[in-house]
Amino acid sequence: MDKLLINGGKALHGEVVISGAKNAALPIMAASLLASDHVTISNVPHLKDITTMMELLGQLGAHLIVDEKMNVQVDSSQVNEFVAPYDLVKTMRASILVLGPMLARFGKADVSLPGGCAIGTRPVDLHLKALRAMGADITVKNGYINARCKKGCLQGKRLMFDTVTVTGTENVLMAAVLAEGITTIKNAAREPEVVDLANFLIQMGAKIRGAGTSTIEVEGVESLNGGTYSVMSDRIEAGTYLAAGALTRGQVTVKKVRPDTLLSQLCKFEEAGAELTIGEDWVSLNMHNKRPQAVNISTAPYPAFATDMQAQFMAMNSVAEGSSTIIETIFENRFMHVQELQRMGANIQLNGNTAIVHGVEKLTGAPVMATDLRASASLILAGLVAEGETVVERIYHVDRGYERIEEKLSLLGADIKRVSDR
């Protein structure tokens, strides 16, 4: 099993090109099942979750061609299987995203209940409730969601999510584009990745209004065409590298980004004392060798501060000047990195969904274990600033969401390498 060896204490300097967003690429790849012709998706990151989605689409009968630049061509005209098996779905929660497209286009889908990061309860009940309201007959038995269309096709409805759900919004959005009539989704997720999916669907012929707001309206069409689409850049990867620059007191520029999707993070970096310069598709952060100031964080759905950046900011606050409060409102079990940061000398107290972080002068390298995707990123960041060697175990988690993270950090001056126990 691979692990990362990090010798910390070096300020990071330089530029890093940000990859395509995993959380946009996965639903877009799932949406290719809706098209009557082949689609070509570019700027797809080379990640384990992406490979899993490719395997899943292939299992369903889609034909995929991938070139050396990770341009992915999907032809779903020959789809002849309607079961998303446990062996694939268990490793990736986003596998649930094939449910809406399969149900809308083929009228049936059997999807194993999803897996992914062990960061608490992320039920699919909201997805199923909405699809049932649109006319689907759904049962859950032996670990599988068995969905069928009662009337041959889904019916447009007025839907209201009880809580904001990104994958739920995406699943229903994809189902609605081929439904009969108009579907209105209230309390819809506003994340940029939802907008990216909507733009992809619109390019293929879908009729969608309001993506990026809390109310999305979809007028169903008979079929979708093929097309070509470039996935948006990864705002969480961008924020992670900016955080690496901030906590090492360095200067880092992230390129090929959309600054408008980073506003909640950028405000907090400025509050921490960073000097920011923002261009059309890049952001430069410069700490001028200053220790960051502690910043308070409260996670919430977009456009508020992203839960996927909480762990990285906790690493920064661990070595910041002053004390901070971090409140996690999205997931109930997303502080699993705290115990590992404490092994490195971080001063953190937990009380329910709140962490109190007292910044210390330095962290000390230690063997630590990644427990989920973003927790692994926080441990790597902590290793970059710690004195001595940090060994991060179970980095298959980080490989699910960061493309070549050790190579990109090395280009910024980090002393980091991947080694294998094999």
Curated annotation (Swiss-Prot):
GO MF terms held by the record: UDP-N-acetylglucosamine 1-carboxyvinyltransferase activity
Subcellular location per the Swiss-Prot or TrEMBL entry: Cytoplasm
Active site, renumbered: C117 (proton donor)
Binding of phosphoenolpyruvate, residues: K22, N23
Gene3D superfamilies: Enolpyruvate transferase domain
Residues the record lists as 2-(S-cysteinyl)pyruvic acid O-phosphothioketal modifications: C117
GO CC annotation: cytoplasm
Pathway per the UniProt entry: Cell wall biogenesis; peptidoglycan biosynthesis
Pfam families xrefs: EPSP_synthase
Taxonomy, superkingdom: Bacteria
Enzyme Commission number, as recorded: 2.5.1.7
UniProt catalytic activity: phosphoenolpyruvate + UDP-N-acetyl-alpha-D-glucosamine = UDP-N-acetyl-3-O-(1-carboxyvinyl)-alpha-D-glucosamine + phosphate
Top EC group: transferase
BP terms from Gene Ontology: cell division; cell wall organization; peptidoglycan biosynthetic process; regulation of cell shape; UDP-N-acetylgalactosamine biosynthetic process
Residues that bind UDP-N-acetyl-alpha-D-glucosamine: R93, R122, P123, V124, D125, L126, D308, I330
Keywords, comma-separated and alphabetical: Cell cycle, Cell division, Cell shape, Cell wall biogenesis/degradation, Cytoplasm, Peptidoglycan synthesis, Pyruvate, Transferase
Entry keyword annotation includes Repeat: no
InterPro entries referenced in this protein's UniProt entry, alphabetically: Enolpyruvate_Tfrase_dom, Enolpyruvate_Tfrase_sf, MurA_subfamily, RNA3'P_cycl/enolpyr_Trfase_a/b, UDP_GlcNAc_COvinyl_MurA
Family statement: Belongs to the EPSP synthase family. MurA subfamily.
HAMAP family: MurA (MF_00111)
Protein function: Cell wall formation. Adds enolpyruvyl to UDP-N-acetylglucosamine.
Protein name in UniProt: UDP-N-acetylglucosamine 1-carboxyvinyltransferase
Organism in which the protein naturally occurs: Legionella pneumophila subsp. pneumophila (strain Philadelphia 1 / ATCC 33152 / DSM 7513)
